[in-house]
Amino acid sequence: MGTYPAFSGSLQLPEQRLHGTSNLHPAGGYRIELQVQDATFDKYPAKQHAQRVAAKLKKEKGLIFLMGQKAALLEDSDQETRFRQRRYFFYMSGVNEADCDLTYDIQSDKLTLYVPNFDLRREIWMGPTLGPEEALKRFDIDEAKYQSFLEGDIKQWASCSGHGSTIYILHGSQKPTGDFPNVLMDSETLKPAMNACRVVKDEHEIELMRHANRVSSAAHIAVLQGIRKMTNEAQIEGSFLNTCVSLGAHNQAYGIIAASGANAATLHYSKNNEPLKGRQFVCLDAGAEWDCYASDVTRTFPTAARWPGTEAEQIYALVQNMQESCILRIKEGVRYLDLHYLAHDILIHGFLAIGIFKAGRAEEIKKSGASSLFFPHGLGHHIGLEVHDVSPDSLFAQDNDRTTDSWLFSSTYLSPCTASSPTLKSGMVVTVEPGIYFSQIALDNAKSEQLKHIDMDVVKRYMAVGGVRIEDDILVTKDGFENLTLAPKGQAMLDYIQQGNGSCNI
């Protein structure tokens, strides 16, 4: 059992969050109230995860060994690096503490955690470290021991298991310490099996991701409520971090992107230090982490409670249409790459309507790759213990004889937005994050077959928009989806900017 800052208060959500079939825009908007208070959470289901991995391995015997992240010092310094637990280790332990290892004996179904040996000096300076007795109370394990027992326990297991027994490890560099001459070290089999398990989330994992999204959505709302008084991108980043930390989320799932104006056309902009004056839009891509689980949320908004111009409003509406059209089609069995193609189709028809693309056949424009100049990334990716979470391709990818539209596809796209990815499965969590970007460097390096479809005189009117991206985290269900992300969009977003005091209580 653990004590964490927990969700509390009232929450008004769009109906689609629960059912995935209704209006994406609740008439009353969104209301999130979060506060820090003590609450008891169930144990992370580490033992169930170990059993799932063993079943995926399809082995009756063997020992799984996973090495946790070690505490380390910065180079030429006595200061420790920021600790980040190895995600595969966390998946089978639920332990977010340094210097731990674990074993899982497949045959006996025994999960053992090894914690750091008692160190009096460290206890005095840094406080109590995790001991065996506490570990047994807090975590879903069968046994807890000090690290000093690990080598002897593995040797005893090897002796009982016989010559040629196998220890399954993630990497050759993560072998258990010691000499085990009659044991095979298999570093090829475990990772694909764990990936196949990690990509489909259980209810405990989903609830952690719901809470990460609650915190992130509250932080996005706090930015909206304060944006009219902000003058620099750094203040946006600071506001977001302040809300997250105040609500108990001390880690971000990735580096915050607070990009205003033309900076929003840089997909992974990170400087976050330019003035907002004269900029039409801010693209804020930021997501908190909760108990090692990520959220990934992007909102694009003006610095005032109104659209900065016709062009900005048109592009925002087009991206919102791209996103919502794709989200509404999500359910088990859908091929995600088809949603990526749908987003491009909507972009192309939208650009034809506003004149960015010259009159012509949409299919010809599509084949030229012209739309990829403005939407150069994949529609989304898996999310979980990593913001760009693992892919299941290696174990249950399916043959797909459908032609890949190479003009809309890049080898840099992440699963499930790849040709080899399996169809969506209930329990997967994916992002849906279409965007439209007016990048001068992309246009300057465009191919002639792309440029012939683009009216550059019209494009000039839209360059000041910079970039618009909207991103939500979507849980796939049997019959539809659940949108885990609660931050407002569109008119509801403008209303929060106008209110400036709102109802996101911290």
UniProtKB/Swiss-Prot annotation:
Keyword Zinc: no
EC class (word): hydrolase
Cofactor note: Binds 2 manganese ions per subunit.
Gene Ontology biological process terms in this record: proteolysis
Keywords: Aminopeptidase, Hydrolase, Manganese, Metal-binding, Metalloprotease, Protease
Cofactor: Mn(2+)
A Pfam family recorded for this sequence: AMP_N
Example of a GO MF term: manganese ion binding
Residues binding Mn(2+) 1: 296, 433, 471
EC number: 3.4.11.9
Binding positions (Mn(2+) 2): 285, 296, 471
Keyword Repressor recorded: no
Biological role stated in the UniProt entry: Catalyzes the removal of a penultimate prolyl residue from the N-termini of peptides.
UniProt similarity note: Belongs to the peptidase M24B family.
Protein name in UniProt: Probable Xaa-Pro aminopeptidase PAAG_05466
Organism per entry: Paracoccidioides lutzii (strain ATCC MYA-826 / Pb01)
